[in-house]
Every structure is written in structure tokens, then in C-alpha cells.
Amino acid sequence: MFLCVIIPCLCSYLCSLFSWLLGQIPSFLFDKINESWLTSTKRNVEIVKNLMDKISQLPDELLVKVLSFLSTKDAVSTSILSMRWKSLWMWLPKLEYNFRHYSVSEGQGLARFITSSLRVHKAPAIESLSLKFRYGAIGSIKPKDIYLWVSLAVHVSNVRELSLKLFNFAELPTKLPKSLCKCKSIVILKLKDEILVDVPRKVCLPSLKTLFLGRVTYSDANSLHRLLSNCPVLEDLVMERDKIDNLGKLSVIVKSLQRLTLKMSRPCHLDGLKMNSPSLKYLKVIDERLESDSDDESDSDSPRYFYDFEDMPKLEEADFVLTFQNIKKFFGSITSVKRLSLCLGVYTEEVICFHHSIHLIVEQ
């Protein structure tokens, strides 16, 4: 019990100390030590040296725990402090590379560093790998780099959580290795923006529990169905669609699913939604594809606004933002929901009874 209390406190203290120590070291020291700076700040260097000598006496396990509280960039920069620290960061269970507004040369340097860091990573498994690249020079980090990093994370490091966000990254959506669809270790998968979801015929994701698909592109209309059909323990699914992404009718048939969030806005296309998830407890649908009541495609009986919900006996909470009129068909199978939030973008006189609701919010 004593260790359970003292270790988090010690980690918090050392993390604050590291932040201060790293603040004494200029950013260019990550690439090359500047001798003139060392001369002009000899006192600070001595302070850092004395503190590091004391900290370095701690066991590796505790030091790695401390480093895990720092950003990956700061954790890596500690490798220059002494030989004792040179490879400690390679045992980090979580790696996060978040870059924006990078030049061609910076992007190329980042690509080399990330490749080498994944190749020499020593932890038995990567608990979390996050790669986020935004507003960089297109072509500086290539799609083949992303392909390689995901392959290394899957084959070498048994990654458990993978998060990819690629914005303003390449002219075409980035393709991921098919091995990702057969990764037995992955529990959380988040894909966002310029990524191609190309699902092979053989898929096996036995551990995947959380899936986030944000504004991605699908290789064909059945890609999502093949993916979801092979996630036997999936519990949380989030989808955001705001473009032509090659999906037609959306089928969410996952017996284990407990939470579903679906957000759609123009110009994404949908030929209807079919859902059969008897374990569902929370459902959120934001459908903003209509701009006005005068829209040429505002016919609520059109297949593109047809929602086929199977019975959801365990549904406890639902949150809807809708812009089409025929809502009675929409709510036919969820009248047993206990907590409902409803925001309508159109006027309707239809009456719907929710016999089991104990909390109801309606906005228009």
C-alpha cells in the first residue's frame, strides 16, 4: 500500500524536475551540443549534473515510468544527458509523434528518426503509438513511411493502441498494410483524415474494442462491412463522414457493440443505415446532410434517409441531431430508451411515445 502511494508521488515530482532540467537545455542540443552555450552557463550545467547523478541512481523501471509522463520529444532528449540515459527512452510503452507546419528537410529528418526509433524499440509491446502530421510539406514524409511504421508496430512491437491522423499529407489517401487487419494485439484503432481503409477478404481483429474512423476513404462499398464483421469483441464505434468516401448502404451488425456514434454531413452519400446491435447501450446520430426544407433530395422516404434499426433492448441513452422530416420511422425501434436528447432541424407534427423514458430533451 505504501508503494502504491509513494511511487506516483515520486513520479510526479521527478517529472516536474525533468521539465525544469530540460528547460535548461536549448532545443538545438538535441542535434548538437553548442560549446559556447556550455561555457556561458557553467553554473546551470553543474546543477543539472549534480541532480542527474542523484536521479541516475534510481532503478531503470522507475526512470522509464518517469519518462512516460513526458512528451516523447522530451523523453528522447534525455538521451544526451549521460550514457546512463542514452537508451532508457527506448523502453517507453507509449510513443507520440505530433508534428505540424514542418518543412521538407524537417519531414525527411523526422521520417529517418521515427523509422530508427521503431526498429530499436526495446519494450516487449507498444502500449500506444500516435502519429499525427498536419500542414506539413507534402512529400516530405511519404505514404510509404507510414506504411513501414505501421508494419513495424504490428510485427515487431505488438502495438495495442494505434492512432493515425494525416491532414494535408498527400495527394491521395494513404494506404495501410494489410497486416493491420490481422493484428491480434490491437485493442484501440483510430484512423482520421487522408487514410484509405482497404480491408482484405481475410480479417482477424480478435482484441479490437474501440474503433474510430474519422473522414477516411474506403476502397469499396463493402470495406466497412468486412471490417466490422471480423471484430468479435468491438464495443465502441465512432464514425465521422463529410465527403464522398465510397460507402453506399451502411451496415453495422456487431453483436458485442455497446456504443455507436455516427456523424454525417454534406457531401457524404448514404443509401440507408442498417443496424443490428442487441448489446447497444448508447447511440448518437448526427445527420446534417440536408441544408434546407427545399432541398431537392429532402424526401424522407428516399433510401438515403432510411434507417433500419433492429430491436435494441439494452439501449439506455440516445442523442440525435436530425434534419429530415419523417422521424417516426426513425424512432420506431427505440421507444424503450430511458434518456433521449433530440434536436430537429425541421418542423414536424408527428407524435412519438417513449414509454420508458425518464429523461427527455427536445430542441428544434
Swiss-Prot record:
The organism of origin for this protein:
Arabidopsis thaliana (Mouse-ear cress)
Q: Where are the annotated LRR repeats, by residue? A: 158-179, 185-206, 207-228, 233-254, 256-277, 279-300
Q: Which UniProt keywords apply?
A: Leucine-rich repeat, Repeat
| Highest taxon, organism lineage | Eukaryota
By its UniProt entry, which Pfam families does this protein fall under?
Answer: F-box, LRR_At5g56370
Record's Gene3D superfamilies?
Answer: 1.20.1280.50, Ribonuclease Inhibitor
**Protein name (database record):** F-box/LRR-repeat protein At1g55660
Pinpoint the F-box domain residues. Answer: 52-98
The record's annotation in PANTHER family points to: F-BOX/RNI SUPERFAMILY PROTEIN-RELATED (PTHR31900), FBD DOMAIN-CONTAINING PROTEIN (PTHR31900:SF28)
